Every structure is written in C-alpha cells, then in structure tokens.
C-alpha cells in the first residue's frame, strides 16, 4: 500500500512541475468523448507543442495544490488537463475547437501566463485569432488610411495631367 501512495505523490509532484513550467494550461471535463476523438486531440496538441493528460481528480488536485493553484476548487467528473510550453493560446484553441464539435465537453477553467481564467473568459480568449493573425489585422488597420491618402493624391495628380 505504501508503494502506491509514494507513486501517486511522485506523479503529482511531476505534474506540478510540468504545470509550473508551462505557459498555459486548461482543465476540462471530457465525459462522453470516445477514444478516437481523444487520440485525435492528442495528435493535434502534439503538433502545437502541447500535451494532454487524463488523471484521477485526487492526483490532479494534489498537483494543483503543489503548484499553489487553488482557483479550481473541487474537481468532479472525468477531467483532463492540457498544457502548452511553446504557445500560450494553442492548448486553449485546440480544446475550443473540440467543444464546437462536441457539446459534452465542459471547460472548468485555464491559466494563461499565471492568470486564472474561468470557462467564459477561456472561450473568448480561445476564439481570438493567433498572434500572426492579430498582427496582420493591426497592420491592415494601420495601412488602410495611408493607402486612402495615396489613392487620393494619385487621383489629384492624374486630374492635373
């Protein structure tokens, strides 16, 4: 009996360290998902540098406590945690895309760069475009007025000729 307790303690410590070193993580309830969907999610997450882990609630609770994260409270039901070490938003986006197809998924919350986000805020952040998309939107907003001025100057110069 002592070996299993030691194993669970080591596992929760290892998960806690991975949570601390990640840029973001999300916890969600996966009740109703089949194995093929979870496997596809794992593959998609691997491409983004993220990892999915299904844990017993007690082990997940201990890992969160060791990481000094108390906002999730009691975890009930079958829960999974996804964390990312490369991109902050990628794990949230992948789970968000999965919730579009499967209404049985319930997001419990997430942590992004040390800030707790509830389910609603997590969904709104995950629905935003990625960083490159936001940069292109900003660039088009900045170049739009300049382009208008250039077209007006070109039209004025053509009318004078």
UniProtKB/Swiss-Prot annotation:
One of its GO terms (molecular function) is large ribosomal subunit rRNA binding. GO terms for cellular component: ribonucleoprotein complex; ribosome. Keywords: Ribonucleoprotein, Ribosomal protein, RNA-binding, rRNA-binding. InterPro entries: Ribosomal_uL10, Ribosomal_uL10-like_sf, Ribosomal_uL10_bac, Ribosomal_uL10_bac_type. The keyword Ribonucleoprotein applies. The keyword rRNA-binding applies. GO terms for biological process: translation. It holds the Pfam family Ribosomal_L10. Belongs to the universal ribosomal protein uL10 family. Part of the ribosomal stalk of the 50S ribosomal subunit. The N-terminus interacts with L11 and the large rRNA to form the base of the stalk. The C-terminus forms an elongated spine to which L12 dimers bind in a sequential fashion forming a multimeric L10(L12)X complex. Forms part of the ribosomal stalk, playing a central role in the interaction of the ribosome with GTP-bound translation factors. This is Large ribosomal subunit protein uL10. It comes from Malacoplasma penetrans (strain HF-2) (Mycoplasma penetrans). The gene is rplJ.
């Amino acid at each position: 009996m002592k070996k299993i307790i030691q194993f669970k303690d080591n596992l929760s410590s290892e998960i806690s360290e991975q949570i601390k070193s990640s840029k973001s993580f999300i916890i969600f309830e996966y009740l109703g998902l089949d194995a093929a969907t979870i496997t596809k999610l794992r593959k998609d997450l691997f491409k983004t540098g993220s990892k999915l882990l299904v844990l017993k609630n007690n082990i997940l609770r201990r890992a969160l406590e060791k990481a000094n994260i108390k906002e999730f409270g009691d975890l009930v039901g079958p829960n999974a945690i996804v964390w990312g070490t490369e991109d902050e938003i990628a794990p949230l986006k992948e789970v968000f895309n999965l919730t579009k197809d499967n209404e049985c998924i319930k997001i419990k919350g997430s942590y992004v760069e040390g800030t707790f986000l509830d389910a609603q805020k997590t969904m709104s952040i995950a629905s935003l475009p990625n960083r490159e998309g936001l940069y292109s939107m900003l660039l088009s907003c900045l170049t739009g007025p300049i382009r208008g001025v250039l077209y007006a100057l070109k039209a004025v110069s053509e009318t004078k000729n």
